[in-house]
């Protein structure tokens, strides 16, 4: 169960980061303020919820196990940047993502 909470905390944290990125997207001057406030508001909600879930994780898992699992954020952000904004991700970056996932599996199996 705590693993699900950890993944959800990670996804909400990344969601907050992605909302911040979306807030910076260029728009016409007329809708800019509303666009900015909407995405920044969503970012705050996501990050606030992530913080609450993170506190639940820290009550259960040792910080030495829990904190490295937040490396999932790098994986989620890379996938989102690639799929949502069609950013180029070089092979070396994908290798890094694979190594991060491997590290998470190794650390997770030790818990």
Curated annotation (Swiss-Prot):
Disulfide bonds: none annotated. Keywords: Cell inner membrane, Cell membrane, Lipid A biosynthesis, Lipid biosynthesis, Lipid metabolism, Lipopolysaccharide biosynthesis, Membrane, Transmembrane, Transmembrane helix, Transport. It is a multi-pass membrane protein. GO terms for cellular component: plasma membrane. It comes from the Bacteria. GO terms for molecular function: carbohydrate derivative transmembrane transporter activity; transmembrane transporter activity. It is found in: Cell inner membrane. Pathway: Bacterial outer membrane biogenesis; lipopolysaccharide biosynthesis. One of its GO terms (biological process) is lipid A biosynthetic process. Residues 40-109 form the EamA domain. The chain crosses the membrane at residues 38-58, 61-81, 91-111. Coiled coil: none annotated. Translocates 4-amino-4-deoxy-L-arabinose-phosphoundecaprenol (alpha-L-Ara4N-phosphoundecaprenol) from the cytoplasmic to the periplasmic side of the inner membrane. Belongs to the ArnE family. Heterodimer of ArnE and ArnF. This is Probable 4-amino-4-deoxy-L-arabinose-phosphoundecaprenol flippase subunit ArnE. It comes from Salmonella typhimurium (strain LT2 / SGSC1412 / ATCC 700720).
